[in-house]
Structure formats: C-alpha cells, structure tokens
Amino acid sequence: MHIAKLAEKITGKPFYDGLTPRMTEEELETAVEFINEHFVFLESKDGGMATIDSVIDRTKQAVMRLGVRGLLIDPYNYIEQSGQEEHSGISHMLSKITSFAKAHGIHVWFVAHPQKMYPREDGTYSVPKGMNISGSAAWFAKADLGITVHRTDECVEIHCWKSRFKWVGQQGVSALSYDLPTGRYEQFTPRVELPSSLKGSQRDWSDFDDL
C-alpha cells in the first residue's frame, strides 16, 4: 500500500483504475526503481508492537549500511510506551529520538493526530496545533518544527505553528490544492465569481462574428 501511494506521487497518475487514466506498467516499474533506491521500510517481522528502542536500532543499521538520512514514523501511537503513563512515555520517546537524530545527523518526522476537537458556535473547527496533539504537551515543547495539515471545504491549509530555528522557516500558513487521484499537492488558486449584478450583463462574443 505504501509503495502504491508513493508511486502515484512520483508518476502523477493513480495506481488503480478510475476516471483519471492510471499509470502504465512501465511507469510503475520506473517508480518502484526510484522507491527502492530512496526508501527503506522498517517493519516488525514478528508482528509485535515496536518500541522506540527497536525503531532506533533498526534505523541505526539503515543509517550505517544504506546512508539513510531521514526517518518517518507514521503514526507515532504504533510505538509501545512500555507501561509508562502516556505523557511521560511520549516525552521520554521524543528525548530519545532527538538525541539519536542529532548524533547521526538525520531528520525525523512524526505523524501525530490531535485530541478530539469541538466545534465553535458557528460550527467550524479551530486549527489543531502542537498543544492539541493527543497525549502530551511535549509534542509542542520538544519539536524543532511543527506543521498541521488542515483540510477545509475549499482547500488544504498548511499551518506552521513552530520553527525553532529561523533559517529553517517561520510561523505562517499556506493554501494548497489536493489532487485525490494522485495524492499530490499544488498551489491553491481561489475560484473567482462575478458579482450577481454582472452575471446577466456578460456579452455573447458570437454577436461580433460579423464584424
């Protein structure tokens, strides 16, 4: 499933049949070659829950043997907390992974989901940020960079709510469009509608055919 999703993003075409023409076998083969050259999937072979120590150990081997420079953990709650209280377990996990990342010069991404959000009086929801991530405020305190992918009816908003180092980025928001068949994002272009007072006054250009 992960390979299929990555192949869609690489080729810009869907993996499965649908309204949008799917990728060809040749395009899939090229995408898989790229994935094999740039990605390593760390899975628990015995089917058990991973611990942060087992993740670090396997990542260390990938760094030393394959030159891996980044680690994506999605989602974080698949990592067992070894009986610790959730807040303490998350704080301990983040401290360990931060020390490991600095020691080996790699970047680590965590995918985490917010706690239950409640609607405002107008029925809309506020954008979840670091303090709203389920489990612990340590997500905000210990992250170097934090972003939220927030979907609205019109677009997808990317909110940067923390950037520890100014040369990496700054707080702000950017609007993108999401292409469902391929999983790609692109710059959002708002739809512009004419005021109702002008809609009936548009000229039919066929009137000028004889000019």
Where are these regions (language model features)?
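Walker A/P-loop NTP-binding active-site region of P-loop NTPases
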Residues: 1-18, 75-80, 142-144
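Hydrophobic/aromatic beta-strand patches that form the interior of the parallel beta-sheet core
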Residues: 40-42, 109, 145-147
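C-terminal regions of RecA-like/P-loop NTPase motor modules
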Residues: 13, 17-18, 32-34, 49-68, ...
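Conserved protein kinase catalytic core
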Residues: 2, 80-81, 119, 168
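Short, ordered loop/turn segments at secondary-structure junctions
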Residues: 76, 113-114, 151-152
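Structural recognition of the conserved hydrophobic beta-strand(s) that form the central parallel beta-sheet
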Residues: 72-73, 106-113
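Phosphate-binding/switch loop-helix module in NTP-utilizing enzymes
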Residues: 40-103
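Nucleotide-state-sensitive switch-loop elements of NTP-binding domains
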Residues: 9-43
